[in-house]
Amino acid sequence: MKKSIILAIGNELVEGIIIDTNSKYISKKLLEIGYKTVAINTLPDDLEILVEEIRDSLKKADLLITTGGLGPTEDDLTREAISKTVGKELIFNEKLYNSILKKVKEFHSEIPKNIEKQAWVINGARIIENPVGTAPGQILQIGEKQIIILPGPPVEMKPIFEESLKFLEKFEKIYQKRIKTLGIPEAILVEKYKDIIYKYKDVNVATLASHISGVELRFTGKKEKVDEIVKLLKEKLSDHIYALDNETIEEVVFKKLEGKSVSFAESCTGGLISAKFVSIPGISKVFKGAIVAYSNKVKEKVLNVNKNTIQKYGAVSKECVMEMAKEVSYFLDTDYAVAVSGIAGPTGGTKEKPVGTVWICAYKRENDYYLVEKFFFRGNREIIREKSALNAFNLLRRILS
């Protein structure tokens, strides 16, 4: 696989004023045509540093891509740095200059004196005009190496980068699958299933742990090998794997319902589960509605939860969520239901039931089947609510399976 390096250039990036979103986009696109990005470096507008990094990158990679530093000001130094590094002079392109002037005149009555800087290009470079702004892109061949020079603003970078891909040699397309898991820590997941995860040395494995959405495993390599690993993990981790690739858990649940209906009884999530579900187009085919039973009185009066249940076990209990789930399924006449009750904090916790204690129940009306679990979530109020919603969908997914 060919190697690529991306250099994101600009003081505003180094100082954290602007977040670099370009590199993620570029790296993903390059992987699709057979280039593996081995480094992404953020650099200041400093000529010496730029020259050193460009020289070092060309030793390590087949393709170098730079973003930023192509403006008309004195601190825009990418052109100069590349010119100095590869030993090719900057030349003035009259045709490009006239094109830039035409664009500037459309929006400004006065022409900035320094705008001509953007018409200086590296000798021998292929010019890719900017359809949005004024700084053009450039493609340079240095022996067997290639350099793609792109502007920094994403709205300008993307169309120029897409055009530049036409001039890159296409290699074997790389195949990638992503597995999203819940309820199993990264360390345990990797240790317990390492023989499957690392079955093939030529399949690249990346793990990404999130404090809300669990652990994601990414496998990159030949299709047949990646698919085999995914198949084996799905067999072992059916309770934990909730989605693949770009799927959300809400979309997975929607597909699994297959015309069956569902309702929610929400307490600590306060309607969050419903809000996430209705973001899916066509969800009215399966979702009948929800009851936000935040107070005990609403649980008793609307959901018909037995008052003795709450007095004996509390609203945050297995017994309470089981009644909530069953009652909402009958009240709204649905095949399935999910109920959630917990303590989101920051107050309200006790020694027996600390902040973060959440009970979730998924209910199947056909055979009066309950799937109930107790969770202890860490984090602030919003994180606890998010985790509760995600795990509520996962319990529903499991009961549907």
From Swiss-Prot:
| Alphabetized InterPro entries for the sequence | CinA, CinA-like_C, CinA_C, CinA_KH, Competence-induced_CinA, MoaB/Mog-like_dom_sf, MoaB/Mog_dom
Where is the signal peptide, in residue numbers? none
Q: Which Pfam families match?
A: CinA, CinA_KH, MoCF_biosynth
Coiled-coil annotation reads none
The cross-references to CDD domains, in alphabetical order and at most eight, read:
cinA
Known Gene3D superfamilies for this protein?
3.30.70.2860, CinA-like, MoaB/Mog-like domain
Record's family? Belongs to the CinA family.
The record, for NCBIfam families, names:
cinA_nterm, molyb_syn, PncC_domain, PRK00549.1
From the Swiss-Prot or TrEMBL record, give the protein name: CinA-like protein
Organism of provenance: Thermosipho melanesiensis (strain DSM 12029 / CIP 104789 / BI429)
